[in-house]
Amino acid sequence: MTFVENRIYLASRSPRRQELLKQIGVDFMVLPLREALPRIPDVDETPLPQESPPEYVERIARVKAETGRKRMSERGWADFPVLGADTAVVLNGRIFGKPENPLHAKQMLRALSGQIHEVLTAAAVAAGNGTRVCLSRSSVRFRNLGEQEIDHYLACDEAYDKAGAYAIQGRAAVFISGISGSYSGVVGLPLFETAQLLEESAIRIFQ
């Protein structure tokens, strides 16, 4: 299916994902999945029983994209592809989503301290020709963190809407001694894989 305009809907309120799309020149409009207060998920992000971390993020990204496309259709909006994404931090098979409160955030950072964890980000594009999903996997190494610096970091308030309670593009960059994989994927949207999905829906990055 070819779209008249080189434009997409982004089914996310994430400022990081918006900035990443701007970085590669994608013309997009934000499509909130429902009217919601900040920090309330647009979809139910509860993992299913026996669901692996990769299956989890791929499912949530798909649901976000397809829910956005359903809303687009119900409201009679212009027919553009809908991009959804989801990120999870995984340590020893355990999924770390967004922290529920400051204590939860502190527990996450304590667990990540001195460890190598995996960051999974799935992107999904729902269009007239179906839904395509991609998965980015990256490894991130944290140095050992002291209690005081964890407290100071949490006081800066950048942790609470991030998977794993940290922002690699923010002050938490000083915690990270190494990364293998996709930096943009760790931030929240793997640009290489996302560009490939968009190309498959006739959205050209360079035209």
UniProtKB/Swiss-Prot annotation:
Q: Which GO terms describe its cellular component?
A: cytoplasm
Function per UniProt: Nucleoside triphosphate pyrophosphatase that hydrolyzes dTTP and UTP. May have a dual role in cell division arrest and in preventing the incorporation of modified nucleotides into cellular nucleic acids.
Q: Which GO terms describe its biological process?
A: nucleotide metabolic process
Important for substrate specificity (site feature) positions: R16, T87, Q169
What does the UniProt keyword field contain?
Cytoplasm, Hydrolase, Nucleotide metabolism
Name the record gives this protein: dTTP/UTP pyrophosphatase
- Coiled-coil zones: none
| Entry cofactors | a divalent metal cation
Active site, renumbered: D86
Tell me the GO molecular function terms.
dTTP diphosphatase activity; UTP diphosphatase activity
**EC number(s) from the headed UniProt entry:** 3.6.1.9
* Compartment(s) of residence: Cytoplasm
A Pfam family for this UniProt protein? Answer: Maf
Q: Please tell me the species this chain comes from.
A: Nitrosospira multiformis (strain ATCC 25196 / NCIMB 11849 / C 71)
Q: Which family does it belong to?
A: Belongs to the Maf family. YhdE subfamily.
Q: Record's Gene3D superfamilies? A: 3.90.950.10
**Alphabetized InterPro entries for the sequence:** ITPase-like_fam (IPR029001), Maf-like (IPR003697)
Quickly give the catalysed reaction. dTTP + H2O = dTMP + diphosphate + H(+); UTP + H2O = UMP + diphosphate + H(+)
